[in-house]
């Protein structure tokens, strides 16, 4: 992050850095098999590796990992919200903004192996 502060290695165990020859993009681990990132990164991925949520320029994408990761001191998924953040509250979760809650049912459906349509 440009202008950001250095953090402890255990401080954000849900952050994922994707390297494709060089640093490619940041993501959020949401369970042992899935990461959440911005859909505008999709043009750089093999098509079978990701799902783009909505054709209406929704900038959200899920990527299924080749194999599940194991939780450890340095690796743990971010807990997805069970209710939307209140207006004006600070989420304090990198890459998890208020709008992500709008897509929570879609995210849960894809992870469960089902399909869902745009809200």
UniProtKB/Swiss-Prot annotation:
Q: What does this protein do?
A: Thrombin-like snake venom serine protease, with high clotting activity in vitro. Also has fibrinogenolytic ability, showing a fast degradation of fibrinogen Aalpha chain (FGA), a slow degradation of Bbeta chain (FGB) and no degradation of gamma chain. Also causes platelet aggregation in platelet rich plasma (PRP) and washed platelet suspension.
Tell me the InterPro entries matching this sequence. Answer: BRCT_dom, Peptidase_S1_PA, Peptidase_S1_PA_chymotrypsin, Trypsin_dom
Localization per record: Secreted
**Modified after translation how?**
Contains both N-linked carbohydrates and sialic acid.
Q: Where is the active site?
A: 40, 59
Listed GO biological process terms: proteolysis
**Family to which the UniProt record says this protein belongs:** Belongs to the peptidase S1 family. Snake venom subfamily.
**The name this protein goes by in its record:** Thrombin-like enzyme TLBan
According to its UniProt entry, this protein's organism is Bothrocophias andianus
Keyword list (alphabetical) reads: Blood coagulation cascade activating toxin, Disulfide bond, Fibrinogenolytic toxin, Glycoprotein, Hemostasis impairing toxin, Hydrolase, Platelet aggregation activating toxin, Protease, Secreted, Serine protease, Sialic acid, Toxin
Q: Could you say how this protein's activity is regulated?
A: Strongly inhibited by PMSF and slightly inhibited by EDTA and soybean trypsin inhibitor.
What the entry lists under Pfam families is as follows: Trypsin
What EC number(s) does the entry state?
3.4.21.-
């Amino acid at each position: 992050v440009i202008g950001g502060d250095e953090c402890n290695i255990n401080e954000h165990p849900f952050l994922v850095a994707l390297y494709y020859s060089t640093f490619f993009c940041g993501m959020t681990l949401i369970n042992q098999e899935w990461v959440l990132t911005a859909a505008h990164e999709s043009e750089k991925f093999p098509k079978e590796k990701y799902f783009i949520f909505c054709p209406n320029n929704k900038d959200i994408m899920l990527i299924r990992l080749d194999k599940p990761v194991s939780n450890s001191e340095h690796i743990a998924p971010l807990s997805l919200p069970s209710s939307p953040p209140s207006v004006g509250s600070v989420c304090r979760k990198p890459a998890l903004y208020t709008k992500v809650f709008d897509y929570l049912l879609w995210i849960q459906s894809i992870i469960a192996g089902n399909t869902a349509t745009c809200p």
